[in-house]
Amino acid sequence: MFANAAGDPEAGKLQAMVCAGCHGLDGATPVLPEYPNLAGQNEKYLYNQLAMFQSGTRDVPLMTAQLIGKSEQDLEDLAAFYASLPAKGGEATGTDEDLRRAQQIYKGGIMDKKVAACAACHGPGGVGNAQAGFPRINGQSVGYTIEQLTKYREGHRKSDESFGGMMRGVAHGLTDGEIAILADYVRGLRP
């Protein structure tokens, strides 16, 4: 399930009109903090997530319903459109102590709990790795990141199958507190 990089952002813009109801006209101002910021997200990652929503592999009924009848080209166009938009940053608001601890986890992991460094896949600025299909995580809302890391930890999100369950393995070693400080920290990362 990988994009052919043949998406047309202009065609995707037309497809995205219905998406604006939840993700905002700019793709970066979701109406609820649990919804992702899509603007500037890596195209390959977006396409793969859309395809998983459509097939039901990633179980979010609202998204599956929105994608009924969409062709592969439609999904590629949507991914190209959102990838073409300027990314929106955020601000970390945690205490200095929490931000230092989150930075340690992000850059170095937690060896004794077998938690890999987030930066290994998402990069030092949280922009991900477009070629590998790893997502941009900087600028996401704290609520969205907490929800996704918790779903990975509890085994409810399995969209990492093509990577051997990597995110589930990483998140499994994180406490609620560590997830919360990481979510705040990555929101404020700058490329």
PLM features: what roles do these ranges have?
Residues 1-16, 26-34, 84-112:
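Electrostatic cytochrome c docking/interface patches
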Residues 1-10, 51, 176, 187-191:
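N-terminal export/targeting leaders of redox proteins
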Residues 8, 15, 42, 49, ...:
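Stable alpha-helical elements in mature extracytoplasmic
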Residues 11, 18, 45, 62-65, ...:
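Extracytoplasmic/secreted proteins, especially bacterial periplasmic and envelope-associated proteins
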Residues 11-17, 43, 108-119, 138-147:
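Sequence context surrounding c-type heme c attachment/ligation sites in exported
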Residues 17-25, 78, 115-124, 182:
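The canonical Cys-X-X-Cys-His
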Residues 24-27, 40, 123, 139:
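Periodic glycine anchor positions in long extracellular repeat architectures
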Residues 30-37, 52-94, 130-136, 154-179, ...:
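Axial heme c-ligation environment in periplasmic c-type cytochrome domains
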